[in-house]
Amino acid sequence: MANVIKLRKGLDINLKGKASKDVALQVSETDEYALVPEAFVGVTPKVVVREGDHVSAGDALFVNKACPEVKFASPVSGVVTAIERGDRRKVLCIKVKADAEQTSTDFGKKIVDVMDGDAVKQALLEAGLFGYINQLPYAVSTTPDTTPKAIFVSTLRDMPLAADFEVELLGNEQAFKTGLTALSKIAKTYLGAGVNQPNVALMASKEVELNIFDGPCPAGNVGVQVNHIDPVNKGEVVWTVDPAAVIFFGRLFLTGKVDLSKRVAVAGSEIKTPGYAEVLVGTPLSAFVVDQLKTTEHVRVINGNPLTGTQASLASYVGGHTSEITAIPEGDDKDEMLGWILPRTDQFSTSRSYFSWLFGKKKEYALDARVKGGERHMIMSGEYDSVLPMDIYGEYLIKAIITGDIDKQEQLGIYEVSPEDFAVAEFVDSSKLELQKIVRDGLNTLRKENA
């Protein structure tokens, strides 16, 4: 029997343009793919290929400079055409021109049931998939020298316009189950699901503990689930794995090959027919997003969801952890005379500042990317905690990070949080602070101090 955890704090933001599971979007043919190191937080990339080299799917394109054992696999076979760099020679992406006939490095099929934790780790390291595992504390890509006390997989995606994992699971049930079994060989594994995810619930086994989360966003955040099941104390480590990566792991053990294909949601109020596209990690957005845009002007394209994603362009690529591509109005062409004094029935407000609350919680909004205000002092106390379903004092933690008080940060639970946990708090924040950036900077500083 699954353990049901009910959460009251949080906020569901209902945006127009949710992806329909019945709409399969066309993906234009492309021979250019790219792996973006920035998608793997905490990794300093060291490129191990040169322009002109031929690679097979599964061969390493770059490694983690701090831990060269952790490789990152090419999604396709082909010729390396470019290694793009930015300021201070930062690696932006490694481009590969795909072969007409794809070839994959064969790592050999494996029977997960007879493997131990070390064998599972080694298999993931060899295939260039280990870097898809993240860790708490610090919310970064992990390394094999860490020993997790538990592993968490959250299949509940409840951020606005987020992809439904039930759609991605269709046809990948065996791979997902195999991936979960493999992770359970390393440490106790917890599977988090929502109340409306019956297919995910069927994936649970005796090796994996199933927990059902019932509550508003951000109940699906893996950090929230860790906080309610097995909190992280100083000196402890837990691993967190995106469910799409679990499928990658399962395919590796079942076929012996690296297959980085996934179903990505294309959603948002600026999308003609929101749906799902079958793509590879590294697919250019121009191959499946450009034809779906209502207009290419005054549009914010986001690699991810509107709260935690990163601003992208049609020249960007699907990231290693991307589950949706969203498009919302930029808002830079709006001119609202007396906007603050109008009823604004089409605008969302958590404080009932507009009359839109009269239409109920099911009303959908076409929100744009405007901040509508500048940074100001933190005066409204309790705002963050009202939407943060964790046993921490979010407001005091943010203040401790801003002031650089490491001792206070540790006392207030910084080891348990990741930037995405503060995404909803950032949305409701009347002080207009970039809370996710503040948390990320604090975690990076703490990681350097403890290195």
Where are these regions (language model features)?
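Short, solvent-exposed cationic patches
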Residues: 27-29, 79-85
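Short, well-structured beta-strand-loop connectors
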Residues: 49-63, 82
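Short, solvent-exposed loop/turn positions at domain surfaces
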Residues: 43, 49, 66-69, 273
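Buried, small/hydrophobic-residue-enriched core segments of structured protein domains
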Residues: 70, 84-287, 291-451
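Short coil-to-beta-strand transition motifs
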Residues: 69-77
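Exposed loop/turn and edge beta-strand positions of beta-sandwich/beta-sheet ligand-binding modules
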Residues: 43, 74, 90
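N-terminal, Lys/Arg-enriched amphipathic/low-complexity engagement segments
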Residues: 1-48, 63, 213
